[in-house]
């Protein structure tokens, strides 16, 4: 892998991690079209670190508030809305952890293909469009209860299927439950923090045990590029959806999915 490849891949990861357009659908393009080799475990860990740093920094006030309330609820019996939301995020994380543990090998073996990604990109794009147009968008994240958190968590679990998009699935589920677009996005982004931590830790453990060589220059490129691009993406995404809704991302998903099908049919 060259510095140019590491920059492009980290840029793609950073820009697509938090948009409802599927990072896996985009990361397959360089290998499918340009023949680039797999970036390896070390680089995967690096871009996880970069995107995690971006979302934590952007929502630093919320993260500090939720963490403080979470521990206060354990040691002091805090029952504030922040403590409740923190526990709901924990609950929403459980389905993805269980589903990932049980289904990881099956997904890797049978579902990690360009055909699956093209299909899920279109199907879940249409689902996002329907929900965005027909659901009541009134509630914020603090009005969630354990049933809603679990439902959104199950949507996050489904997103282990390549092309679905973790943020796309969770935002779609939150919109269906009546969250405003901004609240759905915030809840999705806050939910991403424990998932990215767990996924990055798992990949880091695999890296340590694999003995894979580490190129510090490529890793630094990956961390910095994914951090900057993810931070910019979060900022402008929240501003865009308040004015235009999810339609631009639905259109993009449909174009991408059709484009992938067209490319695959010519091979």
Curated annotation (Swiss-Prot):
The reaction(s) catalysed by this protein are: di-trans,octa-cis-undecaprenyl diphosphate + H2O = di-trans,octa-cis-undecaprenyl phosphate + phosphate + H(+)
Places the protein is found: Cell inner membrane
Note whether Ubl conjugation occurs among the keywords: no
Q: Which membrane topology describes this protein?
A: Multi-pass membrane protein
Which chain regions cross the lipid bilayer? 1-21, 39-59, 83-103, 111-131, 149-169, 189-209, 218-238, 245-265
Q: Does the keyword Methyltransferase apply?
A: no
A Gene Ontology molecular function term for this protein is: undecaprenyl-diphosphatase activity
Xref: InterPro entries:
UppP
Q: Which UniProt keywords apply?
A: Antibiotic resistance, Cell inner membrane, Cell membrane, Cell shape, Cell wall biogenesis/degradation, Hydrolase, Membrane, Peptidoglycan synthesis, Transmembrane, Transmembrane helix
Question: For this chain's UniProt record, which GO biological process terms are given?
Answer: cell wall organization; peptidoglycan biosynthetic process; peptidoglycan metabolic process; regulation of cell shape; response to antibiotic
Could you give one GO CC term from the UniProt record?
A: plasma membrane
User: What EC identifiers does the entry list?
Assistant: 3.6.1.27
Write out the similarity annotation: Belongs to the UppP family.
Q: What does this protein do?
A: Catalyzes the dephosphorylation of undecaprenyl diphosphate (UPP). Confers resistance to bacitracin.
- Other facts: Bacitracin is thought to be involved in the inhibition of peptidoglycan synthesis by sequestering undecaprenyl diphosphate, thereby reducing the pool of lipid carrier available.
Q: What protein name applies here?
A: Undecaprenyl-diphosphatase
Task: Recall the taxonomic lineage recorded for the source organism.
Answer: Bacteria, Pseudomonadati, Pseudomonadota, Gammaproteobacteria, Vibrionales
